[in-house]
């Protein structure tokens, strides 16, 4: 009894599946291009980086009141050690939805250098 049901269902299922699914309109179209929004201005990038730095929880209370500019050094002015700098750069990566390569991250020492790198990255948004 079950043998006949399995035999019938195996013949009917593929044709029913084709009828239900049909051909997709997009199946012949290939979208092989990426769309970019307008690049961020340096002022926008700078303000967002400064906001991330001020919100960074490793900062001492003095940093929130301190004036942060493009000349601000992560180690000297903010007092961040290497691990804190990496955590800050990860927070900046998350803010702009980008990935900063390790070699580049090792060279970023100030807010200005970070802003320049992000502004030149077309994937930043």
Curated annotation (Swiss-Prot):
Residues 43-122 form the Carrier domain. PROSITE patterns: CARRIER, PHOSPHOPANTETHEINE. It comes from the Eukaryota. The gene is ACP1. GO terms for cellular component: iron-sulfur cluster assembly complex; mitochondrial [2Fe-2S] assembly complex; mitochondrion. This is Acyl carrier protein, mitochondrial. It is found in: Mitochondrion. The keyword Hydrolase does not apply. One of its GO terms (biological process) is lipoate biosynthetic process. The keyword Mitochondrion applies. Present with 60500 molecules/cell in log phase SD medium. The modification O-(pantetheine 4'-phosphoryl)serine is found at residue 82. Belongs to the acyl carrier protein (ACP) family. Carrier of the growing fatty acid chain in fatty acid biosynthesis. May be involved in the synthesis of very-long-chain fatty acids. Accessory and non-catalytic subunit of the mitochondrial membrane respiratory chain NADH dehydrogenase (Complex I), which functions in the transfer of electrons from NADH to the respiratory chain. It comes from Saccharomyces cerevisiae (strain ATCC 204508 / S288c) (Baker's yeast).
């Amino acid at each position: 009894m079950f043998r006949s049901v399995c035999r019938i269902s195996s013949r009917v299922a593929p044709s029913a599946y084709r009828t239900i699914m049909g051909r997709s309109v997009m199946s012949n179209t290939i979208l092989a291009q990426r769309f970019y929004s307008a690049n961020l201005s340096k002022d926008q990038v700078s303000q967002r980086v400064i906001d991330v730095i001020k919100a960074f929880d490793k900062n001492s209370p003095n940093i929130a009141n301190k004036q942060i500019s493009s000349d601000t050094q992560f180690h000297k002015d903010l007092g961040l050690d290497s691990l804190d700098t990496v955590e800050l750069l990860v927070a900046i990566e998350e803010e702009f939805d980008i990935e900063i390569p390790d070699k580049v991250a090792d060279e970023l020492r100030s807010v200005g250098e970070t802003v320049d790198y992000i502004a030149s990255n077309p994937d930043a948004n």
